[in-house]
């Protein structure tokens, strides 16, 4: 008797768990994926895109973005994305080659921003690629993302 109750309880738990997973994945299957080059940019995009898109980052928290080497699974994930969004200003040195192998739309957020040049150290005279750190420029990132995504998907404006 005890074995029967244990078996039925286990069966009930397994069936409840598998049913809830299926509902979650079905809800997201119809949403397009936006792939960001790094986590901070993905966070900004999530705040712009709200629930209209699934937003993912190629790199994970704590990973060095500047010299990142995309993996084969990154290419597979990117090939099914609606759009790839990167920062620009040389922040992701790997992005140009990465995107050249894909047939995916690309938005480079800092592309139309005037650079702020680094004034000292080894990088003196080069554009500072961390433009989102400035609150003013962070707001420009949001404006650029709203305009770019609205242009690509006017129905999601």
Predicted regions and their residues:
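Positively charged n-region of N-terminal signal peptides that target proteins for export
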Residues: 1-4
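Bacterial N-terminal signal peptides
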Residues: 9-16
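Hydrophobic alpha-helical segments with strong N-terminal bias
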Residues: 6-7, 118
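Extracytoplasmic metal-acquisition and chelation regions
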Residues: 17-157
């Amino acid at each position: 008797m005890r074995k029967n109750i244990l078996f039925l309880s286990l069966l009930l738990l397994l069936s409840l768990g598998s049913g809830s997973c299926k509902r979650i994945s079905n809800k997201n299957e119809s949403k397009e994926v936006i792939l960001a080059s790094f986590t901070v940019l993905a966070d900004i995009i999530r705040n712009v895109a709200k629930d209209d898109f699934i937003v993912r980052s190629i790199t994970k928290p704590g990973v060095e973005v500047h010299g990142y080497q995309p993996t084969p699974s990154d290419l597979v994930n990117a090939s099914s994305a609606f759009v790839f969004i990167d920062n620009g200003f040389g922040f992701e040195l790997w992005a140009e080659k990465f995107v050249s192998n894909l047939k995916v739309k690309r938005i480079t957020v800092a592309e139309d921003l005037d650079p702020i040049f680094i004034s000292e150290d080894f990088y003196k005279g080069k554009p500072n690629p961390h433009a989102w750190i400035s609150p003013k420029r962070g707001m420009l990132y949001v404006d650029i993302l709203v305009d770019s995504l609205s242009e690509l998907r006017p129905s999601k404006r």
